[in-house]
From Swiss-Prot:
The keyword rRNA processing applies. Belongs to the methyltransferase superfamily. RlmKL family. This is Ribosomal RNA large subunit methyltransferase K/L. NCBIfam families: PRK11783.1 (NF008748). It comes from the Bacteria. The lineage of its organism: Bacteria, Pseudomonadati, Pseudomonadota, Gammaproteobacteria, Pasteurellales. The keyword Lipoprotein does not apply.
């Protein structure tokens, strides 16, 4: 049993040095770090100890052959040449894990198949029964690693991966692997015998791993099936001694200094069961609670706060997370003075919302996500200092103060005006400060923060951090509930992709505008269903429509139609190519108790419908897109290039005393007055009259024209 053998322990990238230290402690092995793991030389007893006690290793492999191969024939020949009869009985099942490729073996499934063929053919040539492959519960796992022409064939002594401790029956959302959780604990700076608090513990993995460390419970103590059970080289007597020693080293006389909090009582129930399965239920105290009410369970001791808070892969989840991290940082400073904190997150920018300065940080992968763990020393402060800090936080939250002050100033000015106007949907901020390139809109009790795409010369990380800061400040200044703040990242739109669906929440509510009720949806589309900058245009159209036949072309959700109908239009006709938005317009009509018999809706290519129209209208509102190349349109559309073509068709259906209200959003649009004159039409630019107070900083957001027949 004193024979020294070199094994290989695999680990997640970045944890190799930690694993080396751990293996040296567990089995006094000679270790050499490699990419993705550690070569360690020890006895078979030492290998058993590593299997039982390692918290960081993913698998422990016993190399059988290390060689060079240049083709699948070389691979097959190598496998057939191994004396498998000395390794396992053909009556046992096996499975092949194949990792890596080269020029000849370009597919891991093909590589695994060739290995399987080699093993099966070996036994059949020796006159044995053909062994069976079992993907899920194999007795023997063969591991093959291929790097260019270098190949290592190993026996996987672990069986199932070692992160599968066996204590987790169920988990909450986004669970941590146990090996990663153990690494987070080891990197946190937590000292055994001191309190450990997880304020958002989820299924409890961090606390359970730490509690097992404290109690001396081997992570694999209760594992039933091992990859070496069917191995002919297995030494059962030695394994039994290693197992008995592990039971003896457990420490049952330790204080219960582990505390887990979570808002979700269902997840806490799972955490409690997991702790029971892991043998540490008596060491961990669980409590349901909101992070905003977090209190230090051991105020007279110094310990560590450890946490893997939620983080969103999609930006749309960010407002609530910004608020969560901001409040978390505040509670840490208020309740855990003098303590250490270690926070692990998949969105490093969110860690900045804690407003704490880290003294150490570590990178790690959680599945495909690049994550960051930051360690903090929470400075000790007197009660007076804490009170002063809380007051300072209350005053301006110390986040984006310039932005917060400008937003507060705008709110004071605009909300008074909005109340007088009888509107509850309006813009509060429109890129007033260059470093905060975004818009803030209010829709009743909801807020939309809409980021404009940053210029190419602006660092992406810096722009992202400013956005997070602005959202945090907006939450504070407006007092809006986090679930009523919507964040949109705006890119330059091409064609009709402004109508692409982003989500399917179906959260509609209505806003009011000069007596009209209009449905909006803040989450499912890039736009909300209501262009706020056209508010005065809609009001004007409504006033002009009284007693007239009205056409709304490129109607979007029909908001101008609502104003016209409410103001006494004789009839309205609404045309849009999008069935989604035409249905939206119908819902707007129903909301305002406007009957469909007087308010017709047509889903059609607007230009084609116009060419075929034989009716005449006294008032026409047309607000076409700047550019479109929709597959449902026969030709592309460019408002600068094609507006005279449009006017040619509109003149045909316009009554002699009729009016066209023409608007578009193209910056630098130039009206073709000569082309209009040839048609017998004249235009008046009224853009300045249709620009509301909340958009006065952006006079080029739209241009608007009154077009009539030239009087003889």
């Amino acid at each position: 049993m004193t024979t020294q053998i070199t094994y290989f322990a695999t680990a997640a990238r970045g944890f190799e040095e930690m694993l080396k230290t751990e293996l040296e402690q567990i089995c006094q092995a000679e270790c050499k770090v490699a990419q993705g793991g550690v070569h360690f030389t020890t006895t078979q007893r030492g290998a058993y100890q590593a299997l039982l006690h390692s918290r960081l290793a993913s698998r422990i492999l016993l190399p059988l052959v290390t060689t060079k191969i240049f083709s699948d024939l070389d691979l097959y020949a190598t496998i057939v040449g191994i004396n498998w009869a000395e390794i396992f009985d053909p009556r046992d099942t096996f499975f092949v894990d194949f990792n890596g490729t080269n020029r000849e073996i370009r597919n891991t499934q093909f590589g695994a198949m060739r290995v399987k063929d080699g093993v099966v053919d070996y036994f059949e040539r020796k006159g044995f029964a053909r062994p069976t492959v079992d993907k899920d519960h194999a007795d023997i796992r063969i591991h093959v690693y291929l790097d260019r022409e270098n190949m290592v064939v190993s026996l996987d002594l672990s069986g199932d991966a070692l992160h599968m401790r066996g204590y987790r029956e169920d988990t909450g959302k986004a669970p941590l692997r146990e090996t990663l959780a153990a690494a987070i604990v080891l990197r946190s700076g937590w000292q055994k015998g001191t309190p450990l608090v997880d304020p958002m513990c989820g299924s409890g993995t961090l606390l359970i791993e730490a509690a097992q460390m404290q109690a001396g419970i081997a992570p694999q103590l209760h594992r039933k099936h091992w990859g070496f059970n069917a191995w002919k080289g297995h030494q059962q007597a030695v394994w039994k001694e290693v197992l008995e020693q592990a039971y003896l080293q457990q420490n049952e006389e330790i204080q219960p200094l582990f505390f887990g909090f979570d808002l979700d009582h269902r997840v806490l129930a799972k955490a409690k069961q997991n702790a029971k399965n892991a043998g540490v239920a008596h060491l961990i105290q669980w409590q349901q609670g909101d992070i905003a009410a977090l209190k230090n369970p051991c105020p007279n001791q110094v310990g560590t706060v450890i946490c893997n808070p939620p983080y969103g892969e999609r930006l749309g989840t960010t407002p609530a997370l910004i608020a969560l991290y901001s409040v978390f940082g505040q509670r840490l400073k208020q309740q855990f003075s003098g303590w250490n904190a270690s926070i692990f997150s998949g969105e490093p920018e969110l860690l900045n919302c804690l407003r704490l300065r880290s003294h150490r940080q570590f990178k790690a992968k959680n599945g495909p996500l690049d994550c960051l763990q930051k360690n903090y020393q929470i400075s000790e402060r007197t009660a007076a200092e804490q009170q002063a800090d809380e007051l300072k936080f209350e005053q301006n939250a110390q986040v984006a103060p310039d932005f917060a002050n400008r937003l507060a100033k705008n709110i004071k000015k605009i909300e008074k005006w909005a109340k007088q106007q009888g509107i509850n949907a309006y813009r509060l901020y429109d890129a007033d400060l260059p470093e905060y390139n975004l818009a803030v809109d209010r829709y009743d009790d909801h807020i939309v923060v809409q980021e404009y795409a940053a210029p190419k010369n602006i660092d992406e990380q810096k722009a992202r951090q400013r956005l997070l800061d602005a959202v945090s400040a907006t939450l504070y200044v407006t007092g809006v509930e986090t679930n009523k703040l919507v964040l949109k990242v705006r890119q330059k739109q091409k064609g009709t992709n402004q109508y692409e669906k982003l989500a399917n929440k179906g959260d509609y509510f209505y806003v009011t505008e000069y007596g009209a009720k209009l449905w909006v949806n803040l989450t499912d589309y890039l736009d909300t269903g209501l262009f706020l900058d056209h508010r005065l245009t809609r009001k004007m159209v409504g006033q002009m429509a009284k007693g007239k036949t009205f056409l709304n072309l490129f109607a979007y959700t029909g908001s101008a139609t609502i104003h016209a109908a409410l103001n006494g239009a004789k009839s309205t006709t609404t045309v849009d190519m999008s069935n989604t938005y035409l249905n939206w317009a119908e819902q707007n009509l129903e909301l305002n108790n406007l009957p469909l018999r007087n308010n017709r809706l047509f889903q059609a290519d607007c230009l084609q419908w116009l060419a075929e129209c034989r009716e005449r209208f006294e008032l026409i509102f047309v607000d076409p897109p700047t550019f479109s190349n929709s597959k449902r349109m026969e030709d592309s559309w460019d408002v600068q290039r094609d507006h005279i073509k449009l006017m040619t068709q509109l003149k045909r259906i316009l009554t002699t005393d009729g009016t066209i209200v023409f608007s578009n959003n193209k910056r630098g649009f130039k009206m073709d007055f000569e082309g209009l004159a040839e048609l017998g039409l004249q235009a008046e630019n009224i853009s300045h009259k249709t620009l509301p107070l909340d958009f006065e900083r952006n006079p080029q957001i739209h241009n608007c024209w009154i077009i009539r027949h030239i009087e003889n």
